[in-house]
Each structure stands twice: as C-alpha cells, then as structure tokens.
C-alpha cells in the first residue's frame, strides 16, 4: 500500500507544530515515513509527553517513608504494613467520553484497572470524578446517562466495587465533560512488577485481545481542542470488553506468580507505540517489532494502524525466554492471544518491520526521554475582587437551593448503577464521605476519596489547589483513616494561553504546599490539557484522589448519628461566603476569593479527631454548602431531623476550611470538650440530631419534604 506524502497539512493533522517537525528532521536526518510521523505524533503529544506540564510536575513532593514507587510507573505504590502495598492511580478519559459517552467512560475504567494490575495488584476499589455541563444544555443528559452506564457496565462486569467519587454540573463543562477514573489494588510489597525492559535479545510478547482499528489517533485527539469537526473524531474512541479484561487480569496475575516476567506494560494511549517505547527507554534498550506477528481482528491493517491502535485489553511484556511454554499455556488457558512480536536490542533504535519492509527506524530515546519540553509563558491569576454584600436568606430556602441542585442532591441515581459490594469487602459505600474497603484476611481497611472545588481554583489557583488536598485529607480523617498519599488528575484548558497556564502553575504550587504539609505525597497522576471547545475552556479542575489507612476497623468513624446526639464543629467558623455553593446556587454569583486554607490547622484538627475518635459517633468534613448542608446530609442518611442554633447566612452556609462536623453522645461531650481545650483546638456545640423536622436558626421544615426534594432532584434534572 502506498503511503501518503508528508505535507504541511498532514503534519498539522497529526498535531505537530512546524518547529516540532523541523526538530524531527534534525533528529533523523531525513523526512519521516508515514508510520514514523504517526509514532512521533503519538509520543510527542501532550497526552503522552507532558511537554507543557513536566517542568511543573517535577516540583511536586513525591517521596516519603511510605512510598515504594512514585510517579513514572503505571501507578503509585505505597506501603501499608505487614508486607503489603496499595497501588493506585487516577487518570482522565475526558475527550473520548464527550465524543462517545458510553465507550469513552467504559474504556477509561478499563485503562485505569490495567494500570493497577499490570504492576501485580488485584484491583479492590474504583472511584470516578465526573464534571458535566449544565442540566439544561441539550447534550448533558445524553452524556450523563452514557458515562454513568459505561462506568457501571465495565466496572460491574469486571468485578471491582465502585466506592466513591463526585459529580458536578457547571456551564463551563458544556463542551467538555470530565471523566476522571481511579483504581486501587493490593499486592505484596516485594512482588511489584515494573515496566523497564532488561537484557538484550529478550522476547517482547503481545498479550490479550486482538488489535483493531478502534482508537487509532486517540492520544493525539486527546491533546487537542474540540471544534465543529467533533463527529469526525468518533472512530478515535476505543471499544472495551470487561469480560476480556477480567480474563486478562487473571492470566497476568497467574503469569506473574510463575516467575516468567522481566517487565510488563499495559497498552493504553498510543497503544503498541507508547508501551514499547516506554519499556525500552526505561531499560536503556532498543526494541525491534515484527508487525506480521501482531494478532489482528481486522484485515489488511497497515503498520501505521497497528502501531497507533488503542484497542483495549492488551499488554506488552518482556519475557524470560525459558518461560515461553509456561506463559503461552497460561494465556491459551484463558483464551487470550499470546504472540512474540519482537525482541530487545542493544542499540538505541525503535525498529518496526512489516512484511519485507522497514516501516520505521528511529532513535528510541528521541521519542521519549528527549521529547520536546516547553516552559510555557504564564501569568498569575489576578486577585479576586472583594465579595459584595450577600443578603440574609431564609435558612430553609437556602438549604432547598442546595439540595435541589443536581450538584448537591442525593446521587443514588448514579451510585445504584454501580456495584459497590462485589468482592464483599466494602465497609462504606458511596454516599457517606470516603469509601472504605476491608483488606481481606487482615484487620486493616483502606479509605478512598476524590476531591476538588473548581470554583475555588478559578478564583485563586493556589488556595484552590491547597483546598483540594485539604478536603481529601478531611474526608479520609472523617472516617478514621490516616491519610497516606495522593494521585492528581490535572484537568485544564489550553496551556498555550498564559492565563490558563497560570492557573495550572498556581494549582500545582498549592497542591505541592498541601501534600508536603499534610504528609500526603503525590505518587501518580495524569494531566489533561486542551479541554476547550471553540476556544471556551473548562473550570480548572485539579482532582485529587487520596488513600488512607485504618490499621483496624475498630478505628472506623461512622457516618450516621443517633437521635439525641449533639452536633459539634471542630475548627473556626468565620463565615466565608466567597465562591460558596450557596452564592452560586441561590444567586447565580461566583464572586469573591476562595476560602484560605490554614494547613497547620488542617493537620492539627485532623490529628485531634483521629486521636479522639472513640468520643464521637459520626463525623463529616465541612466543605461545599458549609454547616447546613453537611448537617442535613448526616441527619438525612440516618432518617433523623436536626436543630442547628447558629444564626445568619454566613454561619450556616460559609465554607471556612479545616472544619469537621461531629455527632457526639451527650454523655461524651464533656470529655470531648476537655480534650479540645487541652489540644488548643476550637470546638463549638451547634445543635442536636433527632425529631422529624429540620430547624435552622428557628426556621423549620418537615424532614420528609426536604428528603423528597433531596432524593429526586438529580434524576429530575437529567430526565432520569
């Protein structure tokens, strides 16, 4: 088949800038072949190379005594004691999910699960953080339903519990939804599998499903803005099969137990190209591939298509040669393809053969380690104008504005489509703060949360970045867990715009300050840029996924109070209404500065709660919606009314940080107050749980009426 001529138009269609193409010519000393152009395009795009963000990502704290492996591998690895490790990561599948919601979201789940089990871990938990356009937008309902169905369809069939996440709506996501998928797994700390190839002449083996044309160019598509050609990009979305993925998991874990694996890498973005280059680059080796050996499910596939296909449920492995028969038998047993498609070579070459032709012969290091890296111009986000006057509101009407909004309404419509109990180790399912999963066969448990408040980040990227980490810290602490580490999913607009790059830089600096202060190093992550449609960008959304440890389930703090329990707030309430949920939902105002985050107070208050967990019956962090929303959610989950005594809009709905709401039996309140005084931690009694009404500063409504609104608003908003 004749390959197309390399023209400026073809170069631009591959997402390469003229100066980048000139650099390619200088590196290889000639014009590239069509396949080589595709390989450079895939490896040098934002999705694979992080060329606009690498400079700043390097500044993040990534080490600590608990960290076994930080960023750079498929997922982060953290020690949880007793010879065990938790392996986790969060990454985006934003562009594919907007184009084809079901498959985009489903393959996002599949990809993050492979990142975890390719390192030798059995997945035990999943989460997802979803951002959609306003419910009235004509595309939103279709996207929401497709994304949720795709996540549930893949995760449920694979057999991993979905234990948490978040869902928000905002007009800034009308043209770009965000689908951030998280997965965590367990492995023996001394049986972690890495991706660096080693040894010359070692067989490179293709594992899993066959290669088709789905997803060709997916990584390049994910590194560009959308415009009116969006429908033409539908073929770049991958198609997933969770049952094949489940077989691939079992085959890989069995293979790993057979001492056959030198290195292993899943085929994700840019497929065979990226997995082979990463393995060779990390091992300082070259790779030779013979594409005639690649299992194909479609006829007449070209070298270009095979190298750039993003067909799902595939792995690439460097195998111990003497173990070929053992490895082949395992994959045949699981009815999966096993094919030797190449070998490691000593030269710094990426050599691609197809038929009797050399389709690509490139310096491998130039594709990865020496890919372009930019120091993009950026400008600091201007300080927000001071918040103007906020009228006093009827507290019940303020609460109704929040619980009647799909962003804050009960999310049962979403969670009920996810299996949260498969594997029978889920202790806390979605809906009550952080998810909690038992570490099977031990007294331990792990807690999981994902958090960010994009309004804050837009108003003040530094404080917004800090707050995302601080809220994750509080959510883990509120279930009794000790926060261990984090993964970041950085979703931003076009980095070539200095104001957008400034948001990114500010958020990174805030995240870095918070993870350092709270001992929650970043161990993995993902960057998704160019989340814009026709030049309109999303809210800056640096999602933080976090994991915490309970050494025993005796440390678990419940989420539901009992009738008669006192409501107390740990922390200081100043009544910060800037960028608050109440302001946005009741008045349509996104004004003022984000609330400041005192990291020392965050740590001190969190440590106080964990140290005094035996004195409280239930706990929740205070964030969006302030005291009123958190207290309502806690009471409603238990089927209880409540009475809050603080008066004034700011006291009830302010979003001051470093605060927790706790429910405490009356006979333990005195001991808790004494402990707070001894620790120098502010503690204020604010009300009581019980009854059949919700009373806020004297205004009252039946719990049943509010609960009905709270539990119906989400489905009604999207026509569910």
Curated annotation (Swiss-Prot):
Domain of life, source organism: Bacteria
Record: residues binding Mg(2+) 1: 91, 526
Location in the cell: Cytoplasm
Reaction catalysis annotation: N(2)-formyl-N(1)-(5-phospho-beta-D-ribosyl)glycinamide + L-glutamine + ATP + H2O = 2-formamido-N(1)-(5-O-phospho-beta-D-ribosyl)acetamidine + L-glutamate + ADP + phosphate + H(+)
Keyword tRNA processing recorded: no
A GO term for molecular function: magnesium ion binding
An annotated GO cellular component: cytoplasm
Top-level EC class: ligase
Annotated GO biological process: 'de novo' IMP biosynthetic process
Alphabetical keyword list: ATP-binding, Cytoplasm, Ligase, Magnesium, Metal-binding, Nucleotide-binding, Purine biosynthesis
Amino acids binding ATP: 50, 89, 488, 525
EC numbers, comma separated: 6.3.5.3
CDD domains per the UniProt record, alphabetical: PurL_repeat1, PurL_repeat2
Keyword Metal-binding belongs to the record: yes
Positions that bind Mg(2+) 2: 115, 266
InterPro entries with a match to the protein in the record: PRibForGlyAmidine_synth_PurL (IPR010074), PurL_linker (IPR041609), PurM-like_C_dom (IPR010918), PurM-like_C_sf (IPR036676), PurM-like_N (IPR016188), PurM-like_N_sf (IPR036921)
Active site per the UniProt annotation: 47, 93 (proton acceptor)
Binding sites annotated in the UniProt record for substrate: 92-95, 114, 238, 310-312, 528
Main location: cytoplasm
Pathway involvement of the protein, from the record: Purine metabolism; IMP biosynthesis via de novo pathway; 5-amino-1-(5-phospho-D-ribosyl)imidazole from N(2)-formyl-N(1)-(5-phospho-D-ribosyl)glycinamide: step 1/2
NCBIfam families assigned to the protein according to its UniProt record, in alphabetical order: FGAM_synth_II, PRK01213.1
Subunit record text: Monomer. Part of the FGAM synthase complex composed of 1 PurL, 1 PurQ and 2 PurS subunits.
Entry's family note: Belongs to the FGAMS family.
Function: Part of the phosphoribosylformylglycinamidine synthase complex involved in the purines biosynthetic pathway. Catalyzes the ATP-dependent conversion of formylglycinamide ribonucleotide (FGAR) and glutamine to yield formylglycinamidine ribonucleotide (FGAM) and glutamate. The FGAM synthase complex is composed of three subunits. PurQ produces an ammonia molecule by converting glutamine to glutamate. PurL transfers the ammonia molecule to FGAR to form FGAM in an ATP-dependent manner.
Protein name in the entry: Phosphoribosylformylglycinamidine synthase subunit PurL
Organism per entry: Cereibacter sphaeroides (strain KD131 / KCTC 12085) (Rhodobacter sphaeroides)
Gene: purL
